[in-house]
Regions:
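Active-site-proximal helix/loop segments of hydrolytic enzymes
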Residues: 1-130
Length: 130
């Protein structure tokens, strides 16, 4: 985790998206969920933008809301930060999707669309510090 923090601080990014895969004790759980830095408005907006695109994926079986999280990667810098949990490896059907290049491309494109949506929002809204 320290190495990731060093990379973030050295890069001085406009935002941070850390991509992960989830695991849960109940194997029927599936879908993508985004966590954001608690108390940070821009992180929350970024999470909402990405989550809304994830929820529109045809493979999505339910809509998630982004959740505030108290995780090291979210709190280690001043930049808007989210963790994108892109699916559940504990769900055999979703795991089968997650290993395919086609589904990985869908996830990557969803992340891209969510980031672009967020950047458009903060660029055009003078109330939001970008």
């Amino acid at each position: 985790m320290e190495k990731r923090k060093e990379i973030i601080l050295k890069a001085r990014p406009a935002l941070v998206v850390s991509v992960h895969l989830n695991k849960f004790s109940v194997s029927s759980r599936r879908g993508a969920q985004v966590f954001y830095k608690a108390g940070d408005e821009n992180s929350h907006l970024l999470a909402e933008s990405i989550q809304s695109v994830f929820n529109q994926m045809e493979e999505s079986v339910r809509s998630f809301s982004p959740l505030a999280g108290d995780y090291y990667l979210l709190n280690c810098s001043e930049y808007p930060s989210v963790i994108a949990e892109c699916g559940f490896l504990s769900n055999p059907e979703e795991e089968a999707l997650l290993v395919t290049e086609e589904y990985q491309d869908k996830i990557a494109y969803s992340l891209f669309k969510g980031i672009v949506k967020y950047l458009a929002e903060v660029s055009y809204n003078p109330q939001i510090k970008g």
